[in-house]
């Protein structure tokens, strides 16, 4: 739900800063997090 989406956004930010969580960078982290959330 909404909370899950927020978690996904946070993960995406981490991906951008850290160099790519799940090898997806900001776009992959944000999109993947939202889908999973």
UniProtKB/Swiss-Prot annotation:
Disulphide connectivity of cysteines: none
Coiled coil spans: none
Signal sequence annotation: none
Region of interest (Disordered), ranges: 16-37
Tissues expressing the protein: Expressed in hemocytes (at protein level).
GO biological process, one term: defense response to bacterium
Superkingdom of origin organism: Eukaryota
A cellular-component GO term for this protein: extracellular region
Modified residues (Lysine amide): 36
Compartment annotation: Secreted
Chief location of this protein within or outside the cell: secreted
Keyword terms: Amidation, Antibiotic, Antimicrobial, Fungicide, Immunity, Innate immunity, Secreted
Functional note: Antimicrobial protein with activity against Gram-positive and Gram-negative bacteria, filamentous fungus, and yeast. Was tested against Micrococcus luteus A270 (MIC=0.5-1 uM), Echerichia coli SBS 363 (MIC=9-16 uM), Pseudomonas aeruginosa (MIC=0.01-0.3 uM), Aspergillus niger (MIC=3-6 uM), and Candida albicans MDM8 (MIC=1.5-3 uM). Has no hemolytic activity against human erythrocytes.
Protein name, entry field: Serrulin
Species name: Tityus serrulatus (Brazilian scorpion)
């Amino acid at each position: 739900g909404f909370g899950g989406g927020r978690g996904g956004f946070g993960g995406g930010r981490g991906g951008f800063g850290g160099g790519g969580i799940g090898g997806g960078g900001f776009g992959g982290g944000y999109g993947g997090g939202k889908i999973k959330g």
